[in-house]
Amino acid sequence: MNYSFTLVLCLLSFCCFSQDVQLFKPDSVRKEFEAVKILNNLKVDGHLNDKEWQLAKPKSDFIEVDPRQGEKPRHYTEIRALFNQNYLYLGVFNRDTLGKKSVRVIDFKRDFNTRTSDFVGMSIDGFNDRRNAMVFTTNPHGVQRDFLSFDATYIDLDWDGLWRVRTTRSDSGWVAEFAIPWKTLRYAKSDEATQSWGFNVNRGRRMTNENYAFSPFPRSFNVLRMDYAGIIKGLQPPPPTANVRIQPYFLTSYDRYRQIDGRKPEDAAVKVGGEIKWAVNSRAVLDLTFNTDFAQADADRQVNNVTRFSVLFPERRQFFLENASLFGIGIGPASDMSGGTMRIQPFFSRQIGLDGAGNPIPIDAGARFVSRSAKTNYGAMYIRQRGSASSPLTNYFVGRYSENLGKQSRLGALVTVKNDSGNTNIVGNVDGFIRFDEAHSLNWMLNVSHDTKGNVTGAAGAAQYFYATNQWKIWWTQSLISKSYNPAVGFTSRSDVIGTTPGIFWFYRGKHVPFKKIIRSVEPSLLVEFYHQASTGRLIERSYGLSPFWLMLQSGGFMGHIMTPTYQYLTEPFSPLGVKINAGSYNYTRHAVYWGSDGSKKVSFNWNGEYGTYYNGKLNTTNFSMLVAPIPHVSITGRYNRNTFKNVGVNNTSKNIDLWSIEGRFAANPRLQLIGFYQRNTDTQANNYNIRLSWEYQPLSFIYIVFNKREFQSTTRLDTRSQEDHLIAKISYLRQL
């Protein structure tokens, strides 16, 4: 099998180098777009009927990126730009012959999913370094999506800038009107009379799953590749100055506990705290937080894990989400699972302010300083976590420095420190990213951990190579984690392991694709994973994920099948969902079938069923989700997961375990929303409720009313149910000085 894979890899590599003709380099002459200066502030209402808009110099020569790369779009798009001493204004007309009938928007969630919605977005590179971008996106209902991108690799999706957008819809299409304050943008100080910035516009028409751009890029890339961006010229921004944002909050809460040891039956509290954000200049930002609270953060979703390895729960707390990309370097799988499943992150913010079960631990104060420029990026963060009877007072520190090399490469270092009364854990890391050309890239890292308690030192490292074009994605990830490596403020999916995880995706859109009105591409793949125990060199896991059948549909739906022959050597027993499996060698084969519909429709679904052998028995798994969104103001999602064990483990266990949930989002508009979530897990007999009313009464100022409820089996008495109820009211106010 090893020789077969090597042969396939060599043959496909030869094919990719000899046949790929659709990847193109950035144009040496960048496409230009001119902004026009005005004196007055505009009324931002989505109509573009202020007389000043007639002074603008419109651009409409967009190019289609997907599916007909390089062709003239079937739907006209026009962009205009104005500016004054306070704002950069952008107006976009998105013509559509079907008018309102073609609009696809499923909900009003901020930072919405562009794969399920019409959208238009601006990528702005204020330093004009062709690497970094601030992205401002909206959909036909004026929902905001904004984030920061660095080398199209690290993304701060949860960065929330202060800006406005309004939209209107008509029988001829839809209009978006943006007003972005200069204080929100990051740009270099210049002595020139005018400035030119990197700039691109990306439009998605979801009904036909088409994508257009002002300055074109290959369809295997995205608009974040600023080396393909055009230029917006004629800008006269004010000199960058320091500005301060203060955001105090007031919170009152009521807590009730039943059958939980160490807790009062009832408790009430009033809490005051807040954050200060000081933009020292256009490059540097200092954030201060005191008596930090995350009551409005989404509750974690339960997961029934049947693998031997740790599940990475996403960070949901706003303070840690901002500038996460600077500190969050690491090696891990991409969203399409390319790169392999191995994950190494020297810093992972959920290790701060949360216990092992995800319950909050109070944070007294914290500070974060970040500076980004065309050449260097550096930052530091300090957090003081409050001590309690169950955990000592703990201090956390993380520092990061990286330097941009050449056009698209980077070298960096990171250090983390966790200090409490019993131990100090230190992790030091060096890492780099090299983009050899448009298709080839290499990401690597080396780090060492040390614990003063016991004087224990460990090491980890990884290198991840990618070759990505319109037709192929090929990767090889090599990783090593020693037995004693301990990133106390980080995350690893496995320990004491040497990982080898190559793979191939083939994206075929040629003339032999059948039923082209339905099928957009055929995408077979091969994902191979080998893991050896680092301390002994013994093979402990081997799997071949073979998918000869995978179809991407013109609608955005998909269907496919993956077969995965697997070898596992368990060095110790483990118990997935309470089913004990002894140590030893196991060979088994899993099959997975996937089917997903058009996610932009009013009713859509995703289903995958897994079946086959599992260690010494069988396991069938069903995952099903359905979205019902009759109008964008109302969306309801149901999810169901069932694991059926048959004669598995020491006791030949046969049982069903169900995990299901329902989530509803009800919005009067993008700024006033009620979100409810309920989840039940038959494995732990747990019921979780989360209901949150959110009103953004002015930009980035919120009123929240939150109710959380947890019911679960008591850990001390098996015949007793424990219960937690939390009712929270919180108001925050943002003031920009």
Predicted regions and their residues:
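Exposed, low-structure sequence patches enriched in small/polar residues
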Residues: 362, 370, 437, 442-737
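A short, polar/proline- and glycine-enriched secondary-structure boundary/capping micro-motif
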Residues: 99-107, 145-148, 187-189, 297-299, ...
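Extended, hydrophobic alpha-helical segments in both membrane/secreted and soluble proteins
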Residues: 248, 270-276, 284, 290, ...
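Alpha-helix capping and helix-loop boundary segments enriched in small/acidic/polar residues
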Residues: 263-264, 307, 357, 387-392, ...
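Extended, well-ordered alpha-helical scaffold/bundle regions in very large, multi-domain proteins
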Residues: 285, 291, 299-302, 314-316, ...
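Outer-membrane beta-barrel transmembrane domain signature of Gram-negative proteins
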Residues: 216-240, 380-435, 558-607, 621, ...
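Bacterial Sec-dependent N-terminal signal peptides
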Residues: 1-25
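Structural preference for beta-rich elements and adjacent junctions enriched in aromatics
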Residues: 19-397, 402, 412
